[in-house]
């Protein structure tokens, strides 16, 4: 959009005071982009199911594969994506690697999402 088009749009604004307040409080584009990328990771149902399981208890790939009726390879692939996105962390105990949520915020985000979904179903 050209500067002239932007100026024209601003002159069409009805509520300048609202625009000013919102502009002042709007986050910068970079964190908004990062949040949208986070939601893309959440957007896969397999990853969402893994997050739900790990919100209950840490688990190894083998147990996650059995729980979700998937191959270990498929689970490992999804865990790699979750780990790269800093949603999941791992710890090794002997030969077994256990996965858990990276922090409580991840579970909180899902709890709010489930609250929203259940609210829509009930109302």
Describe the residue ranges of each PLM region.
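Generic structural signal for conserved hydrophobic packing positions in ordered secondary structure
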Residues: 43, 75-78, 113
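Conserved segment of winged-helix/HTH DNA-binding domains
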Residues: 100-123
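Residue-level detector of secondary-structure transition/capping positions
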Residues: 58-59, 83, 114
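N-terminal helix-turn-helix DNA-binding core of bacterial DNA-binding proteins
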Residues: 27-73, 97-104
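Beta-hairpin "wing" of winged helix-turn-helix
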Residues: 83-93, 100
């Amino acid at each position: 959009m050209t500067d002239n088009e932007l100026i024209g749009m601003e002159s069409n604004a009805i509520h300048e005071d609202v625009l000013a307040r919102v502009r002042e409080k709007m986050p910068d584009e970079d964190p908004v982009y990062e949040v949208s990328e986070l939601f893309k990771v959440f957007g896969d149902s397999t990853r969402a199911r893994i997050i739900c399981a790990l919100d209950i208890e840490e688990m190894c790939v083998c147990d996650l594969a059995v729980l979700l009726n998937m191959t270990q390879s498929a689970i490992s692939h999804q865990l790699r994506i979750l780990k790269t996105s800093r949603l999941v962390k791992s710890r090794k105990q002997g030969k077994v690697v256990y996965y858990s949520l990276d922090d409580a915020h991840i579970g909180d985000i899902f709890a709010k999402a489930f609250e929203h979904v259940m609210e829509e179903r009930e109302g």
